[in-house]
Amino acid sequence: GDGGAVVTHDPALAERVRMLRQYGWRQRYVSDIVGLNSRLDEIQAAILTVKLKALDEDNMRRRAIAERYRAELQAVPVVLPGDPPGGKHVYHQYVMQCGGQRDELGRYLRQHEIGTAVLYPIPIHQQPAYAERFAGVSLPVTEKLARTILCLPIYPELTDEAVDSVAEAINRFYAK
């Protein structure tokens, strides 16, 4: 499943996050703000406790995979992710912009047994749940990204050989 954590030195932010995770409660059964039930159960917490011990190592491995993709895909007409100014990307996802050939590339990679994903193909402002609130809104950059992004495999256990296979397949696709 999905999970997450918030780390902060700001006591006010920490308090707000604690409230948001459990119905907006500052005290039991009193919702001071609108919140959700997004607490981890015991099993999820136990798994997270083990996984947190490997977080730095896993992040370093994903960064190494991203650097390998960057080195091997520099000749193809895609936009690859990188570190934000003043920051350090951990590559939870490896999202590249493929332009108008996203769907064709995705099919090609799947034909070569390479898993890909298209995350959030429908922008929030075009979701039925928000139709009334965002009626008539045009967000051309968001809409373009929804049509052009493709996620490549990236997880700590991915071997260098597998990364090379993904990159080779992408290079072959764009060479034809």
Feature roles, as predicted:
Residues 9-176:
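PLP-dependent aminotransferase class I/II
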Residues 1-6:
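Glycine-rich phosphate-binding loop of ATP-grasp-fold ATP-dependent ligases
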